[in-house]
Amino acid sequence: MIHYKNKEEIELIRESALIVSRTLGILAEVIKPGISPKTLDKKAEEYIRDQGALPGFLGLYDFPATLCISVNEQVVHGIPGDKPLVDGDIISVDCGALKNNYYGDHAFTFAVGEISDDIKKLLRITKESLYLGIEQMVVGKRIGDIGYAVQHHAEKNRFGVVRQLVGHGLGKKMHEAPEVPNFGKRGSGRKIKEGLVLAIEPMVNLGTKNVIQLADGWTIVTADRKPSAHFEHNIAVVDGQPEILSTFQYIEEALVKQQASFI
């Protein structure tokens, strides 16, 4: 069952989403060769708690960390470890926060130092596909229109779109109905209505669309071990149109300060 949100609920979700946005902005300042994912995880937990919120992922389904940090061929759900990042890595950082009983949840894929042109393109196309999907989130359209927009843009650039992992509704639960696949047919699926809140999150691979789960029970990797990118926003339907509740502004400002390249 889909729970459509009123304006007060949407504002509470926005508050949690912006805590995540600011957390990712703080991490953007320090993501560089030599830092470990576990260090990033600790920094994120401290900041989220300082905002009077709780880490949204920690303990959820028994996940052991504040962040899902997925490096290179890891698609999602990577557990932060001690291995330092190196020049040329890409790192997806997925973060959640819970405040006032409502969740925020979004993600950004960062370049660590200098990355190759083909991986720069992967990041750019994945991010573009996110916004193309968001454009479809208008009253009267359907969930399949979102997936089609994401899939079409990624696949016309010869990238693989992950099938087994999807976006979702968001609210008092981290994962609410409906599921939001990153593939689909125009005019298919549930109708989009006023008050719908979604987490749209393209997961796009440099090579095959196929993925497997590692023995840790969490980490998803590409079957061909080629890199994967992941971007995610939280969006509400307000006055019939998509309104993005999260922002990448803090990340982009931090990356400019660091004189890092970003898409």
Residue ranges and their predicted role:
Residues 1-263:
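Active-site neighborhoods and metal-handling regions in enzymes and metal-associated proteins
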